[in-house]
Amino acid sequence: MLIDSSLELADNATLPTSGTLTNNLVIGGSIDLRGTIGIGDNATVDLSAGEPLYLVIEVTTIPAGSLATYNFTAFTHTASVDAGDAAAGTELFRTGLIAKALLPAGKRFIVSLPEADYARYLMVAGAANATGGGVIDTGNINAFITKDVTNWTGTADRVPATDPTT
């Protein structure tokens, strides 16, 4: 999978240890969708150049703690929001409550980003045990935007398992 480093929202970033369904905390920080090209918040800019863009959230370290569920969201906002702060702006995507047992290392959430009025910044946020009562002690994710969501897995000899010569 090709990953553009300027479209990386979280690189093995630690999950926030609190938050609720109405107070999601940013994971990894915000990325500037407009960069230094001076476009501003122009909703007519096609960020994907006519092709679908995908948000990929990948669990790298299994969440641990007394939490029962976790919730991931994506937001767009006119201002940058730092990691650990409450997410703000327009919600683009929500996973809904996910049981901790369903978040093993390597689990990926892949969603086609909607056509929307994107503000300048994009962020991924999360909330530990959004139903209340639990906390998260550890847990990490990668999150990025890509056009290539092929779920390719390398092998030790770099030869696909379907190659008849192996």
Q: Which residues make up each language-model segment?
A:
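Surface-exposed, low-hydrophobicity beta-strand/loop segments enriched in small/polar/acidic residues
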Residues: 1-166
